[in-house]
């Protein structure tokens, strides 16, 4: 876990990291990210045009808190209730392809590695610490 991650508001941290990720041109979103739903429980695609960067920032925050995450964990974490009509709602996970794509982007950027205990590399940790310091001010 990175020091100070709990001392900043998650919304402000995610917003600052999202703007940083958008400014670097290293992120390659999914091909149909503008029209695809994020999970089986969703009825429509996200309204925000930059939802992929928001999800990516949120996943980086989860990695910095938990240490290591999998695409199955991310699918469960970002899932939702599916409206099944008159039957009771049922919790379904998000599409794991989104989490896999984000993890692949972070690997290509050099922010994470495959180590099971600590996924963030030194480059990723320094960027997250810089964002935390920027949000604290």
From Swiss-Prot:
<dbReference type="InterPro" id="IPR036388">
    <property type="entry name" value="WH-like_DNA-bd_sf"/>
</dbReference>
<dbReference type="GO" id="GO:0003723">
    <property type="term" value="F:RNA binding"/>
</dbReference>
<dbReference type="InterPro" id="IPR001266">
    <property type="entry name" value="Ribosomal_eS19"/>
</dbReference>
<dbReference type="GO" id="GO:0022627">
    <property type="term" value="C:cytosolic small ribosomal subunit"/>
</dbReference>
<keyword id="KW-0963">Cytoplasm</keyword>
<comment type="subunit">
    <text>Component of the small ribosomal subunit.</text>
</comment>
<keyword id="KW-0689">Ribosomal protein</keyword>
<dbReference type="GO" id="GO:0003735">
    <property type="term" value="F:structural constituent of ribosome"/>
</dbReference>
<keyword id="KW-0687">Ribonucleoprotein</keyword>
<comment type="similarity">
    <text>Belongs to the eukaryotic ribosomal protein eS19 family.</text>
</comment>
<protein>
    <recommendedName>
        <fullName>Small ribosomal subunit protein eS19</fullName>
    </recommendedName>
</protein>
<dbReference type="GO" id="GO:0000028">
    <property type="term" value="P:ribosomal small subunit assembly"/>
</dbReference>
<dbReference type="GO" id="GO:0006412">
    <property type="term" value="P:translation"/>
</dbReference>
<dbReference type="Pfam" id="PF01090">
    <property type="entry name" value="Ribosomal_S19e"/>
</dbReference>
<dbReference type="InterPro" id="IPR036390">
    <property type="entry name" value="WH_DNA-bd_sf"/>
</dbReference>
């Amino acid at each position: 876990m990175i020091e100070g991650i709990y001392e900043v508001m998650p919304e402000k941290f995610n917003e600052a990291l999202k703007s940083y990720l958008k400014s670097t041109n290293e992120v390659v979103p999914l091909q149909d990210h503008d029209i695809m739903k994020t999970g089986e429980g969703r009825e429509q695609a996200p309204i925000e045009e930059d939802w992929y960067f928001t999800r990516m920032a949120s996943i980086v925050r989860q990695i910095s808190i938990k240490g290591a995450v999998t695409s199955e964990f991310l699918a469960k974490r970002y899932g939702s209730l599916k409206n099944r009509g008159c039957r009771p709602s049922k919790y379904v996970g998000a599409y794991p392809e989104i989490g896999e794509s984000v993890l692949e982007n972070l690997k290509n950027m050099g922010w994470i590695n495959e180590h099971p205990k600590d996924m963030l590399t030194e480059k990723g940790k320094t960027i997250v610490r810089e964002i935390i310091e920027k949000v604290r001010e």
